[in-house]
A protein has these predicted regions:
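Sequence-structural signature of the catalytic-core scaffold of metal-dependent phosphohydrolases
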Residues: 2-48, 65-70, 95, 99, ...
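Short amphipathic alpha-helical segments, especially helix-boundary/capping motifs
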Residues: 36, 74-79, 110-115, 132-135
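Active-site flanking loop/helix segments enriched in acidic
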Residues: 44-51, 55-65, 69-92
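Alpha-helical scaffolds flanking conserved acidic
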Residues: 57-58, 109-121, 172-179
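Short acidic, glycine/Ser/Thr-rich loop/turn "cap" segments at secondary-structure junctions
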Residues: 80-86, 114-123, 136-144
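Alpha-helical phosphate/pyrophosphate-handling elements in metalloenzyme active cores
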Residues: 82-114
Length: 184
């Protein structure tokens, strides 16, 4: 196995920074630039300092590795009391949202990695049975004098505090904000 020397590592880092600046110049003035990405905490491990992925690409990977994301697989998007091939799974819904969001973002020259990360993570905190479950939880919470269950806030909670055995993932503030505000 060939070990990279410092000059090679520096060249790759400089090239990544150059590509980031070039990409940022292609974005709309209203878009969040990759170079403006802010992480909640400083990275814990040294190997991430040499990561050639852009910050929002890192967020995509972290969301894809979330156990909450992996649980999308067998969840239906809507509650149904009968079997139907026409009731989509949550994983398909999330893929459709991601695809449509990226298409819109591309047309507006927005940051596609930020959009994809937000779209993939937008439903991580849904209650069982989707919006029906969320309404049922809210009724019970109101009866007991508590606040509301908001799946968008629960999505952020899952990412920051529940994933990785309570360590959470270090996802950018911009992605967390997009997930938190995705439903208005």
């Amino acid at each position: 196995m060939k070990v990279m020397n410092m000059k090679e590592e520096e060249r790759i880092i400089k090239n990544t920074i150059k590509r980031t600046k070039e990409y940022d110049r292609t974005l709309s003035p209203y878009a969040c630039k990759t170079s403006e990405c802010q992480k909640l905490r400083k990275e814990e491990s040294e190997h991430e300092e040499f990561d050639i992925r852009w910050p929002f690409e890192e967020d995509i990977g972290r969301i894809l590795y979330c156990k909450s994301y992996q649980r999308y697989t067998d969840k239906t998007q809507a509650l149904s009391f009968f079997q139907s091939a026409h009731i989509s799974k949550r994983s398909i819904h999330v893929q459709w949202v991601s695809r449509i969001a990226r298409q819109i973002g591309k047309g507006l020259n927005l940051n596609l990695d930020l959009i994809e990360a937000a779209a993939l993570g937008h439903d991580l905190g849904h209650a069982p049975y989707g919006h029906v479950g969320e309404r049922a939880l809210n009724e019970k919470l109101q009866e007991k004098g508590f606040g509301y269950f908001c799946h968008n806030a629960n999505s952020v909670r899952n990412i920051l505090y529940l994933e990785r055995n309570g360590k959470g993932y270090n996802v950018s503030l911009q992605v967390l904000d997009a997930i938190l505000c995705h439903n208005g």
